[in-house]
């Protein structure tokens, strides 16, 4: 029997068909020229249903206008009707496609949520890292500390991992907190993954740990911490003390009574062929 199916079955047994899991995450970014950008992501997961909504608030006027203004965008996967909906809450518009249409497109959704076009940071740095010489990479210094004790973070007992990377480009400081209490997290991830798989697609996973990804790219050996990340901070500073700061934090994850309206589009929204 497929191991993944067994795990998901156990999760479903523990989480009643009369309930759903609601997750709220907040990300804050402060970068040169861009300024402050805050993103709130809310996820809803129940048997056969998954919804994700992202609200972006950009502080600087010119950057906000260049991005098309502050946004509130989302998508809904409905396993019972086999449909996928994307919507723009600000414009009160939505578009819909069936799973059959996606299957005919090799498992790739045709309708795109405009949220996917917004790169919330980090891309330019990857390019700079790829352009570094081998000599510069060898000069980098790495320091990683894993706390023995646990801290209480967002209602979870979590272990803190601190990673410092010092190079000719400056200093990168990453702090991450991991919990091994992962039942609700796994349920949300499996619901989304199974719905995506049902139309022949493959769910894109966010990196489990940003520090581990960077250490792997640098071919450094490191000790991994098990569990689910519930918070991280990342700061980058160059020799001029100019820098980039990003904070991501789980605000809440709860099992609540099932609410059908959480997986339905608002009646006031207008149906369109695709979002602008």
Predicted regions and their residues:
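Sec-dependent N-terminal signal peptides
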Residues: 3-15
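Extended soluble regions of mature proteins
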Residues: 19-276
């Amino acid at each position: 029997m497929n191991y993944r199916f067994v795990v998901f079955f156990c999760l479903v047994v523990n989480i009643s068909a009369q309930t759903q899991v609601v997750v709220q995450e907040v990300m804050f970014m402060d970068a040169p020229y861009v300024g402050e950008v805050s993103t709130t992501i809310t996820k809803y997961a129940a048997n056969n249903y998954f919804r994700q909504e992202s609200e972006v608030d950009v502080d600087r006027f010119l950057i906000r206008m260049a991005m098309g203004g502050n946004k509130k965008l989302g998508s809904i996967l409905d396993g019972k009707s086999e449909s996928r909906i994307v919507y723009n809450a600000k414009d009160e518009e939505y578009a819909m496609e069936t799973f059959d249409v996606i299957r005919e497109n090799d498992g790739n959704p045709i309708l795109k949520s405009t949220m996917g076009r917004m790169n919330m940071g980090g891309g330019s740095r990857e390019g700079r890292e790829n352009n570094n010489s081998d000599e510069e990479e060898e000069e980098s210094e790495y320091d990683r500390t894993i706390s023995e004790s646990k801290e209480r973070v967002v209602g979870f007992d979590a272990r803190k991992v601190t990673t410092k990377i010092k190079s000719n480009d400056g200093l990168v400081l990453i702090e991450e907190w991991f919990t091994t209490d992962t039942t609700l997290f796994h349920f949300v991830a499996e619901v989304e993954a199974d719905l995506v798989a049902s139309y022949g697609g493959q769910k894109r996973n966010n990196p489990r740990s940003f520090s581990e990804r960077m250490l792997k790219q640098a071919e450094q050996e490191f000790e991994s911490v098990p569990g689910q990340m519930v918070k991280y901070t990342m700061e980058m500073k160059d020799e001029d003390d100019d820098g980039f700061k990003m904070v991501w934090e789980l605000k809440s994850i709860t099992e609540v009574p099932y609410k059908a309206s959480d997986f339905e589009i608002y009646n006031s929204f207008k149906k369109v062929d695709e979002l602008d």
